[in-house]
Amino acid sequence: MRFKRVFLIVMDSLGVGASEDANQYFNEGVDDTKANTFGHIAESMDLRIPNLEKLGVGNIIPIKGTKSVELSSSYVTKIREKSLGKDTMTGHWEIMGLYVTTPFQTFTDTGFPKELLDELEERTGRKIIGNIAASGTEILKDLGEEHMRTGDLIVYTSADSVLQIAMHEEIIPIEEQYRISAIARDITMRPDWKVGRVITRPFLGTNKDNFKRTSNRKDYALKPSEETTLNFLSDANYDVIALGKINDIFDGYGINKYSKTVSNDDGMKQITEWAKKDFTGLCFLNLVDFDALYGHRRDPHGYGKAIMDMDSQLPELMANLNEDDLLILTADHGNDPTYVGTDHTREFVPMIAYSKSFKSGGSLPILNTFADLGSTISDNFKVKKTEHGDSFLSKLK
């Protein structure tokens, strides 16, 4: 084992330019060929990221205001996605060695099909309102009072592959809410309707001005269809620590310690705390704010500020790393906040590998699949590998 601990941070949606197959992916009828999340954010504002610059992010692609530097303790490149799809679950599963060959369904522009909703109404005995892509807080303002009067289910989606059901805890008891959501999960297992997650979204309050979502949210995710690098690590008794939404993305499969995060800031603080602890294995963090708060909302300045905030937290994390630790920064897809539409964009993702033990650094060739990350981690811990991906461990000198 070369590295006792591997810290893997997924900067959710921070792509570095359209992939070769971006012409097959679309936002409101426009293909993704001109997308470049990181590049376009830098062009739209004064982006100052000294720590990412030192690590070599400006060596991966041209980023306005960020220099290409001589690398002494980091290796950088970009990675192409092999799976079909450009969503969070697909990207993360591929990182850990599982390809998605049938994309998860999204219903952002159309809402859910009538047949699906008819079956949900029939099996739950309740009518459905909403059926649009919406912000969870905004839809409560629009439909919460109607739901309280009628008991109808507020069903909505987002740019992700998800079906969400908002229900008031005093109108529909929480256990009944979970039963309704389990029915929705069963219905959405069919290939034509298969969504990555069904989410119960309970709320309380008396009117549209004071509705508030409660902590009784419940996710009905899809378990990965095959074992991933996470399983092989945990089966070999290594620590697999999932921070943020990682546990939900993998439905807990192969994970033996986890905690949620409330923000990117919280995520960076949590991973820094783990760096101060003794463990052997993988600590895996997703920074979701980039995607959820800024990418989908097409807010390049908010996105850029979030990158700068993360950049400012890197030194403390890195100061707590040991000689035999490896830090990897990457992403799971793109979400160009300057692009048309509100959906993800099909892009290459960055890869930065840093260790205090590196004697040199430099640029690696483009990696052919996100699964090279999982393969490298498996190689390091000498555990079974998935059938996808090639390790680049030997290239890290």
From Swiss-Prot:
The gene is deoB. The lineage of its organism: Bacteria, Bacillati, Mycoplasmatota, Mollicutes, Acholeplasmatales. Its main location: cytoplasm. Mn(2+) 1 binds at D12, D332, H333. It comes from Acholeplasma laidlawii (strain PG-8A). Belongs to the phosphopentomutase family. This is Phosphopentomutase. Isomerase that catalyzes the conversion of deoxy-ribose 1-phosphate (dRib-1-P) and ribose 1-phosphate (Rib-1-P) to deoxy-ribose 5-phosphate (dRib-5-P) and ribose 5-phosphate (Rib-5-P), respectively. Keywords: Cytoplasm, Isomerase, Manganese, Metal-binding. Its EC number is 5.4.2.7. Disulfide bonds: none annotated. Mn(2+) 2 binds at D291, H296, H344. It is found in: Cytoplasm. It catalyses: 2-deoxy-alpha-D-ribose 1-phosphate = 2-deoxy-D-ribose 5-phosphate; alpha-D-ribose 1-phosphate = D-ribose 5-phosphate. InterPro entries: Alkaline_phosphatase_core_sf, DeoB, Metalloenzyme, Phosphopentomutase_DeoB_cap_sf. GO terms for biological process: 2-deoxyribose 1-phosphate catabolic process; 5-phosphoribose 1-diphosphate biosynthetic process; metabolic compound salvage; nucleotide metabolic process. The keyword Signal does not apply. GO terms for cellular component: cytosol. Pathway: Carbohydrate degradation; 2-deoxy-D-ribose 1-phosphate degradation; D-glyceraldehyde 3-phosphate and acetaldehyde from 2-deoxy-alpha-D-ribose 1-phosphate: step 1/2. Its cofactor is Mn(2+). It holds the Pfam family Metalloenzyme. GO terms for molecular function: magnesium ion binding; manganese ion binding; phosphopentomutase activity.
